[in-house]
Amino acid sequence: MQETTNKASTPVKKQQTKAIVIANPTSGSYTLHEHQIKHIIAKLQQQGWQVELKLTQSSGDACRLASEAAQQHIDVVIATGGDGTIHEVIQGLAGSETALGVLPSGTVNVWAREVGIPLDLNGASNVLLNGQTRRIDLGKIDDQYFLLMVGIGIDGEITQAVEKQSMKRLKFFSYLLMAAWWGARYPAFRGTINLGDREIKVNALQVIFGNTQLYGGAIKYTWQAKCDDGLLDLCVVRRQSVLRRAAMIIDFLLRRPKRHQWVRYETGETIKITTHKPVAIQVDGEPLGHTSTSEAEPTLLSVGPQALKVIVPVTAPEDLFSRQPL
């Protein structure tokens, strides 16, 4: 009989998670939460993470720092701030193996609300430690990536008006004020949307191209969107009278089934749009110029399938995904 030898198995050492935290030291949210952010970094380090705080100094730094982290094979880039900070960070992470984590401290925090990341920073840090990693799509307009949505029309005009220097300090209240003003007065616009296999003519108040479902923290214009299905969802909000606009907004806020009557809903992988006159664009809540009026050089939207790894709660809404976690 052959003698067998029992050897004690050597425990496999868990690989240390390497991460950087990107924050803007001049933002009010960082000043307010600086002590808590540093406490969270210490908490992650106590759990075996190797974490370094990176402070931005000028526009574009968050993208550069994220890109450098991806090139250095850092496991996680943690964006501290709002959706604007996330928008800048994903420009540097797109197509990489580095995951996006979030400590939400912005005004609306649409991405955090979308996937259920707690808005208190300590709760959000628990998601970093105990959440699940998924790979999702990114939308792209011309050469810029977006995580959430692109809006053309009313919201583009509002976003660009709010970004004027005199209105930046009270951005949230300025947005509400401008929304009320533009909501009643916006004249709508005409354009053509090419979805590859079909072309549609629009007379619209706004057009939303969604990678995700939630818009502005409350409304779901692209309510069928899944952020990992390789498609953009398109919601054309048709031209309405002022009174009907109010009724439409109420239907969307309450998510009534009859909200379908106000819009045309489509999906596509590559979408081209031209308008009769230049129309303002917003991308993830940030202003981005105007639409093209040239059929030869239309405004182009596309999808980067599975372009971004994200850390989200294990309780993230299932209807937002079509694939399993990694």
Q: What is each model feature region?
A:
Residues 1-77, 317, 325-326:
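ATP/NTP phosphate-donor binding region
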Residues 2-3, 7, 33, 195, ...:
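ATP/nucleoside-binding phosphotransfer catalytic cores, i.e., glycine-rich phosphate-binding loops
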Residues 45-47, 56, 74, 94-99, ...:
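Catalytic core of DAGKc-family lipid kinases
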Residues 62, 84-89:
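Short glycine/serine/threonine-rich phosphate/pyrophosphate-binding segments
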Residues 79-83:
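N-terminal glycine-rich "phosphate-gripper" loop used for MgATP/nucleotide binding
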Residues 151, 208-221:
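Glycine-rich phosphate/pyrophosphate-binding beta-alpha loops
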Residues 156-158, 201-203, 215-218, 242-245:
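Short acidic/glycine-rich loop or secondary-structure boundary segments that cap or lie
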Residues 166-174, 223-244:
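Gly/Ser/Thr-rich active-site loops/lids in small-molecule metabolic enzymes
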